[in-house]
From Swiss-Prot:
It holds the Pfam family IMS_HHH_1. The gene is dinB. It comes from the Bacteria. One of its GO terms (biological process) is DNA-templated DNA replication. It is an enzyme of class 2 (transferase). Its cofactor is Mg(2+). The active site is at E104. Gene3D superfamilies: 3.30.70.270, 3.40.1170.60, 5' to 3' exonuclease, C-terminal subdomain, DNA polymerase, Y-family, little finger domain. This is DNA polymerase IV. It catalyses: DNA(n) + a 2'-deoxyribonucleoside 5'-triphosphate = DNA(n+1) + diphosphate. Poorly processive, error-prone DNA polymerase involved in untargeted mutagenesis. Copies undamaged DNA at stalled replication forks, which arise in vivo from mismatched or misaligned primer ends. These misaligned primers can be extended by PolIV. Exhibits no 3'-5' exonuclease (proofreading) activity. May be involved in translesional synthesis, in conjunction with the beta clamp from PolIII.
Amino acid sequence: MQKIIHVDMDCFYAAVEMRDFPELRGKPIAVGGRSDRRGVISTCNYEARQFGVRSAMASGYALKLCPDLILVPGRMQVYKEVSNQIRAVFERYTDLIEPLSLDEAYLDVTESSHCKGSATLMAEAIRAEILAETGLTASAGIAPVKFLAKIASDLNKPNGQYVIRPEMIEEFVKTLPLIKIPGVGKVTAKKLADLGLHTCSDIQAYPEPKLVERFGKFGSVLIERSKGIDKRAILPNRERKSVGVETTLAKDIHTLEQCRAVMPQLIQELGARVSRSAKDRAINKQVVKLKFEDFKQTTIEHRSDEISVNLFYQLLEQAMERQHERGIRLLGVSVGLASNSIASEQADVDSSQMDLGF
């Protein structure tokens, strides 16, 4: 049985800014974006979230929701330095560390002898050391598998932790909303809802062949996750090369106008995914993908250092030149990510949740 800890810093970029500039504390702030440009917010503090401000939101819209919102320019080098401090804390407990971004990581502590082998106590100690050494709070989730540890880290935020023990998994996943499963965004969640699928128990009762037929490989993943299964191991120094979103259409479409109508939701979801899992990474290209009725596919890409909506539409037009009157069954957008230096730089707990066995 694995013991996985998912550590997620609380409002990381915003928290660093409030630590370094105390006059910002207690005020709604957001990092990134500018009021005079179509910028996008990287993250915001809890005061801003009370007004509905969220990551990946256009800064102009965020200011409409919260007129007193303070927009703070990002300081990526500072965030990387703090991230290295946090990484050093992780390394005291395990070498099996899978960074997801500057502010979150998976830790496999299965073989660690710290804290009498208790992942629960190790998570508590890690959070305490991060607070003492950086002045920042972290939340943590503890579970036997990765995706449940990630979900658990969000259940007692901020500055808390939650444990899903092996014997809790079956009951926990029954009522788990599918939108909570990593990889299920708004687009996929709507498709599932259209089939009457809202929770993991709904997936468990749904015919597996139909789910795989509708969602392909991800259908198989959903079946496993609905049962609390996640066979993925921790990948030390993992570095993803791209982030993408695609949708398999209910019916084939044939015109550029029909494709353009699908794009806004895909681009919005892509922006949200980049903000969640790759906000510290530089973008190096944009890609549009089409899969036709004969299951052949084509991709068009172009170099870009930021997400440009106009460029996505230009790439779509170029891809459509390869249609040759075939129906289109899938449409996708993605961005390539430049190599990161994170890996190379190296640079209150509920007592009822404590269990020395886990």
